[in-house]
Amino acid sequence: MNLQENSSQQLKRTMKSRHLFMISLGGVIGTGLFLSTGYTLHQAGPGGTILAYVIGGLMMYLVMQCLGELSVAMPVTGSFQKYATTFIGPSTGFMVGIMYWINWVVTVGSEFTASGILMQRWFPDSSVWMWSAIFAALLFICNAFSVKLFAETEFWFSSVKIVTIILFIILGGAAMFGLISLNGTADAPMLSNFTDHGGLFPNGFLAVFIAMISVSFAFSGTELIGVTAGESANPQKDIPRSIRNVAWRTVIFFIGAVFILSGLISWKDAGVIESPFVAVFAEIGIPYAADIMNFVILTALLSVANSGLYASTRMMWSLANENMISSRFKKVTSKGIPLNALMISMAVSCLSLVSSIVAPGTVYVVMVAIAGFAGVVVWMSIALSQLLFRKRFLKKGGDVKDLTFRTPLYPLMPIAALLLCSASCIGLAFDPNQRIALFCGVPCIILCYLIYHFKRNVTKAKKISQEEYPADHIL
């Protein structure tokens, strides 16, 4: 492919509203919902689990409202990395971009490994490595061929997950209240699992607090819609609509599914169930429930990997476009694909995959810890960028009425987002299982700042040019 670097050869604006919506949902709905919810339910109880998801959803909603104002005013690829560069400082923009890139390349490698393991259910004698390589090659082709192919692939991947969740909520709710009979059960559970076995908070509020920390990270991925802003065909119209839809639908899907799970499965049994979704579908009497959910979870894994590969590639392109890393990574093909950035992102994802086998207790643990911590750091940067953007916008004589998308209740909403995200970070220190994210993430942030300041005399980061977005008078 012919790679070009001239200013006129930028990324292509070909994504439609439905693509933006599904890509954002695809990044957030993964195995955490389908597999890990049982563990959270066992840990925090039914009331604690729902409360944890409500607070996590609230945090996500606050951040998305901040991102909406920024993305509509400045619809550029790289999104929050460029916003952090312009409104917080170039060193913070560099840190945010690197942390977000690490987050996704590690995640993509993990998804490939998990996908290979799932395939062994149907092909027990096959190799995990073989399936991982096949899926990696397929997703690389989807991302390398054209933005439209990637977007369409992600649209259908995400559709499978969303249909499954909707069916689960409808059928599970019907079974919970006696409209559908459960196998081997005379009476519908109704709300008994919320009142029996210790009630809503059987393990106390400390368990709820710890669950809140882990669940708050489960919503990371919705910010992907900001990364797509620079390739949206009509950002002024599509981004506001997509952000509003993603925010409330994600909350409904997550909390609705968790409510049904909590009503149908006792919190005492939830910790030993491999997949609570399989258990519920099997109890309802859905034939081949395990195989169906194996396919859905496989689709979820590939969807997250697909979105993650896209996000890491665009973030690397954005860093190169800001003169923060080698200019080789901002070269694009004639179809607007940053192929060099795609290849290096895929290569590092594969190294992450290898480290999960070769050094699972050392290198891989550290990488996963940093990746998990990166999500909340990015959210904090979005909230702070919006706070500073609005302040500068008003100082330069801007009128809030001129903003197509306005963050409500400014400055309370971005401040609340910052406080909740900060609480999540601090809370990591109180959970022995998640403390490593804090211990590895903070040094990585410091290292990013040191690297940037070491290199700043060699390359200078550029602010978003006035041609790239309509709010040019705030600079």
UniProtKB/Swiss-Prot annotation:
GO terms for cellular component: membrane; plasma membrane. InterPro entries: AA-permease/SLC12A_dom, Amino_acid_permease_CS. Its main location: membrane. The keyword Transmembrane applies. One of its GO terms (molecular function) is amino acid transmembrane transporter activity. It is a multi-pass membrane protein. The chain crosses the membrane at residues 20-40, 44-64, 87-107, 127-147, 162-182, 199-219, 246-266, 277-297, 341-361, 363-383, 410-430, 434-454. It holds the Pfam family AA_permease. GO terms for biological process: amino acid transmembrane transport. It is found in: Cell membrane. Keywords: Amino-acid transport, Cell membrane, Membrane, Transmembrane, Transmembrane helix, Transport. Signal peptide: none annotated. It comes from the Bacteria. The keyword Lipid biosynthesis does not apply. Belongs to the amino acid-polyamine-organocation (APC) superfamily. This is Putative histidine permease. It comes from Bacillus subtilis (strain 168). The lineage of its organism: Bacteria, Bacillati, Bacillota, Bacilli, Bacillales. The gene is hutM.
